[in-house]
Structures are given as structure tokens and as C-alpha cells.
């Protein structure tokens, strides 16, 4: 599959190591974009999250995407250029830690679908290994993001369930929203959608089930993603 068409944009992905997946779509639809004027997408890959957030935000919202892999960055730029939001999106090909250390911009929302497979069996190509395997911990990513977060800003990640539990116990930031993602009703959670902030708030916890017992999409999943998927 070389491309993925959504209701308002198209993602070409033939040059990218990691393709469009449910995790990214969930995060792009779930993250709270209210009152956001500046958004950062850490590790933008194909540009999926960047374009989803552009679709959901007002014209005065600027989005900064950062991608380390030059091949993925080039394709993300093409996807951005083909969208109606290209004038308010800036893409930088850089190491995310270096970018955060050198930018003076602060952000109201920072999102990431970070690498989360531990290094083990080698991938067939270097780009896919870079996209899939993390040499830094998720706590590193969260701490780096916090350095450029506005005072009332939010950081939203999607992670494997166990990794999400570990992260919430490891950070000094406040977890203010947690959605446990269950692939099929009756199963245990597989993923966790998390939002962190500098200021304490009452933690909002819920769950999202993707498929019901008949292997049909649940109403909750359809409601969350209907502005993007052509099939809904």
C-alpha cells in the first residue's frame, strides 16, 4: 500500500519506514486542540498527525513538525504541500532533542507517537529500525517536550499499555487524561492515550473499544474518527 486517503487529505507513504496505523489516527483524533495556537509534532513520519491536527484546528494555529529521517521528512513535506493547510505548517528535518534545545518557540500542544519496540531482532532496513526502535526512553521524550511547553500547554502521547503505565509513574508532570485502548471487547488494553500537563488537574480516565463482539467498529470508535476515515 503506497498511500492512504482520508476525507480531507492524502498520505503518500511509499518512502516511509512506518506506514499509517491506528495508533497515530487515534492520537490525532483524540488530542485536545482547544485554544491551541502553536502545536509541535515530535517525530512526524509521514505527516499524518500534523495533517490531522491541521484539519482540527483554526486557521490561526501554526503547526511545527520535526522528523529525523531525511527520507520520511521529504515525503512528509510532499504530503503537507499537497494539503490545504500547507501555509500554516512548518516541517524541520532534525533530531528532536537538538530541535527542542535550539528553538525559542513554546507550544500549547506537543504530540508524539514515539518509537516503542525495544531493540531486538534487526529490521530489514535502517530507516524502519529508526522508526520502530527507541534508544531513548519515553521519559526522555516527555522531558524534552516539557522544556518547550507553554505554561498551560499539554503533551499527548500514544504508547503500549505497559509503557504508558510506566511513564505515568516516572514523570514529575501531571497526567490529566488517560484513555485505555482495547482492540476488541473482552480483551485487555493494548494501548494507552495519555495527556500530561505542568499544572495539576483532576485525572480523566476512560476506555475506548475499537471492535465489538461481532468484529464491527464500535460507535465510540466511529464517533472519534468519523471526520477522517472515508468508510464512516
Swiss-Prot record:
Coiled-coil region: none
Cell compartments where the protein resides: Cytoplasm
One GO MF term: rRNA (adenine-N6,N6-)-dimethyltransferase activity
UniProt-listed GO biological process terms: tRNA processing
Keyword S-adenosyl-L-methionine: yes
Reactions mediated catalytically: adenosine(37) in tRNA1(Val) + S-adenosyl-L-methionine = N(6)-methyladenosine(37) in tRNA1(Val) + S-adenosyl-L-homocysteine + H(+)
EC id: 2.1.1.223
Alphabetical UniProt keywords: Cytoplasm, Methyltransferase, S-adenosyl-L-methionine, Transferase, tRNA processing
Cellular component GO terms, alphabetical: cytoplasm
UniProt cross-references to InterPro entries, sorted A to Z: DNA_methylase_N6_adenine_CS, rRNA_Ade_Mease_Trfase_CS, SAM-dependent_MTases_sf, Small_mtfrase_dom, tRNA_Adenine-N(6)_MTase, tRNA_adenine-N6_MeTrfase
Keyword Transport: no
Protein name: tRNA1(Val) (adenine(37)-N6)-methyltransferase
Record lineage: Bacteria, Pseudomonadati, Pseudomonadota, Gammaproteobacteria, Pasteurellales
Amino acid at each position: 500500500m503506497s498511500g492512504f486517503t482520508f476525507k480531507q487529505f492524502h498520505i503518500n507513504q511509499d518512502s516511509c519506514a512506518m506506514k499509517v496505523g491506528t495508533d497515530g489516527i487515534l492520537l490525532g483524533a483524540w488530542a485536545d486542540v482547544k485554544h491551541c495556537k502553536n502545536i509541535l509534532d515530535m517525530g512526524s513520519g509521514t505527516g499524518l498527525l500534523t495533517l490531522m491536527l491541521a484539519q482540527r484546528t483554526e486557521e490561526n494555529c501554526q503547526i511545527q513538525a520535526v522528523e529525523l529521517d531525511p527520507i520520511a521528512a521529504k515525503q512528509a513535506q510532499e504530503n503537507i504541500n499537497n494539503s490545504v493547510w500547507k501555509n500554516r505548517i512548518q516541517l524541520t528535518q532534525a533530531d528532536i532533542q537538538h530541535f527542542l534545545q535550539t528553538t525559542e518557540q513554546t507550544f500549547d500542544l506537543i504530540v508524539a507517537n514515539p518509537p516503542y519496540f525495544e531493540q531486538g531482532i534487526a529490521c530489514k532496513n535502517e530507516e524502519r529500525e529508526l522508526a520502530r526502535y527507541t534508544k531513548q526512553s519515553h521519559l526522555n521524550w516527555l522531558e524534552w517536550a516539557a522544556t518547550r511547553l507553554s505554561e498551560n500547554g499539554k503533551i499527548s502521547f500514544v504508547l503500549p499499555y505497559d509503557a504508558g503505565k510506566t511513564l505515568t509513574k516516572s514523570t514529575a508532570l501531571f497526567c490529566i487524561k488517560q484513555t485505555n485502548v482495547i482492540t476488541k471487547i473482552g480483551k485487555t488494553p493494548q494501548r494507552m492515550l495519555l495527556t500530561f500537563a505542568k499544572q495539576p488537574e483532576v485525572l480523566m480516565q476512560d476506555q475506548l473499544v475499537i471492535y465489538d463482539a461481532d468484529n464491527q467498529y464500535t460507535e465510540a470508535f466511529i464517533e472519534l474518527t468519523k471526520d477522517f476515515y472515508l468508510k464512516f
